[in-house]
Amino acid sequence: MARTILAFDFGTYSIGCAVGQDITGTAQGLPSFKAQDGIPNWDQIEKVIKEWQPERLVVGLPLNMDGTEQPLTQRAKKFANRLNGRFNLPVELQDERLTTVSAKAEIFERGGYKALKKDKVDSISACLILESWFEAQ
């Protein structure tokens, strides 16, 4: 039976979101959430979780290219812990190195420079995080 998974691309001003099913291994971008210094509107996240009823959540883990942690790493881990605490769903962290670069390249390829809107980049980054998580399973 297919499991629904939600993924998040954590950021201090915007949090990308994507949904996917493990049976297909593909993800679809959802609208991004605005955040204030990394704090989202939890009611908006709750609404998406209620709508999609995921079995687990995946949060992108920002790391330096050499695999070491960066300042945003701890904040992403804290966000993952809060998701788990608020919604009582299993949360996994997924290495997100280069997802933003890949997302920008994908958007640029589709629509050129004008298409590079931040919320689209965050949603596609969340898709790439989820798809890489599926591949690692």
Curated annotation (Swiss-Prot):
Main location: cytoplasm
GO molecular function: nuclease activity
InterPro entries listed in its UniProt record: RNaseH-like_sf, YqgF, YqgF/RNaseH-like_dom, YqgF/RNaseH-like_dom_sf
EC number, as in UniProt: 3.1.-.-
Keywords: Cytoplasm, Hydrolase, Nuclease, Ribosome biogenesis
HAMAP family, per the entry: Nuclease_YqgF
Protein name: Putative pre-16S rRNA nuclease
